[in-house]
Amino acid sequence: YGGAMAYGESASAGNAVAEYEAYRTNTSRKEFNGNAYLEWEPLKDLKLNVSYALRYYNQFSKSIQNVVNQMNFQTNSIARTMPDTGDIISNSNNEGHKTLFQGRITYEKEIFKGHHISAMFNAAEEYWFQRNMGAGRKNRLHNSLEELDAASKEVQTNDGKSESEGLRSFI
């Protein structure tokens, strides 16, 4: 791939094809959004309402760094090797969900023509959960190999975290 090709051009001139070949990421994502709702009127003027919502996602990414030499065609030499960090491959997984459960009781009555009295009670609970995991290795055995096990075990990293949070409210 070309780098500096014109007289006086910087050796670190950008090359879009080289950037694409050097840093590649493949991502697959699965996601679900669902809602359920029920409303019931057991007595006249009294309504019960229950709803539930769920959002779930799972995303897997594979990042690959290929070593690419950019040539200076005027001097027939390598102008720049990228990335300068070497042959790295990494995998990451991001998974989580959010739930919302809500219940409501409503009473509304017309006591005189044009005059209403109403009361409402609402309870809601939300919950969020997220987990991230990642692993990386350096020094792939060959540029055509894209699996994590296709790299040396000498230089490897692992990381991850999980977090959750909830909220409960009454009105």
Regions found by a protein language model. Give the residues of each.
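Outer-membrane beta-barrel transmembrane strands
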Residues: 16-63, 88-112, 116-118, 130-132, ...
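Conserved "boundary/linchpin" sites in short secondary-structure elements
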Residues: 126-128
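Surface-exposed loop/turn segments flanking beta-strands in extracellular/periplasmic regions
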Residues: 1-18, 66-85, 131-160
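N-terminal glycine-rich FAD/FM-binding segment characteristic of electron-transfer flavoproteins
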Residues: 122-124
